């Protein structure tokens, strides 16, 4: 496989990257406040790419919005961006919600130490 060729694998076969050791103050705070996502409807998030560069082929667009998509069992991946606004340093959590037709899903991101 050449480095620019995409290799698609089943969405349930992608294992997330291990969490790297936090180095900066922002990274340490992000780990301390580790976001959790609670979904009341729709599909659970799946990791998008693994450490070999193999990409999640996505979910089928047919069937119920929350059917057969309750997570891979390997865990998920989230990107947390921190931006210092005044002295507060809030963070924004991003995630991809697949197989949803609604603009606003029922996911709630919360933070708390674990």
Swiss-Prot record:
Superkingdom as given in the UniProt entry = Eukaryota
Query: Entry's InterPro entries?
Result: NPP1 (IPR008701)
A GO term from the CC aspect: host cell cytoplasm
What does its record list under induction? Answer: Expression is strongly induced during the first 24 hours of host infection. Levels increase from the time point on when germ tubes enter the leaf and the maximum expression level is reached during the formation of first haustoria. Thereafter, expression decreases during branching of hyphae.
Among its keywords, does the record have Secreted? yes
Keywords in alphabetical order, please: Host cytoplasm, Secreted, Virulence
Tell me the compartments it is located in. Secreted; Host cytoplasm
Q: What is its main location?
A: secreted
Question: What is said about the domains?
Answer: The structure of NLP effectors is remarkably conserved with a high level of conservation of a central region containing the conserved undecapeptide motif AIMYAWYFPKD and heptapeptide motif GHRHDWE.
| PANTHER family listed in its UniProt record | DOMAIN PROTEIN, PUTATIVE (AFU_ORTHOLOGUE AFUA_5G00600)-RELATED (PTHR33657:SF8)
The family annotation for this protein states: Belongs to the Necrosis inducing protein (NPP1) family.
Function, as annotated = Probable secreted effector that may act as a pathogen-associated molecular pattern (PAMP) recognized by the plant immune system. Seems not to induce necrosis, neither in several susceptible or resistant Vitis species nor in the dicot model plant Nicotiana benthamiana.
**Protein name per UniProt:** NLP effector protein 1
What organism is this sequence from? Answer: Plasmopara viticola
């Amino acid at each position: 496989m050449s480095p620019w060729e995409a290799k698609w694998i089943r969405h349930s076969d992608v294992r997330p990257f291990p969490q790297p050791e936090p180095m900066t103050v922002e990274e340490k705070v992000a780990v301390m406040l580790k976001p959790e996502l609670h979904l009341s409807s729709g599909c659970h998030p799946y990791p998008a790419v693994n450490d070999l560069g193999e990409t999640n082929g996505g979910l089928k667009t047919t069937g119920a919005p929350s059917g057969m998509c309750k997570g891979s069992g390997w865990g998920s991946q989230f990107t947390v961006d921190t931006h210092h606004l005044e002295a507060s340093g809030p963070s924004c959590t991003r995630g991809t919600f697949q197989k949803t037709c609604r603009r606003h899903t029922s996911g709630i991101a919360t933070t708390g130490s674990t």
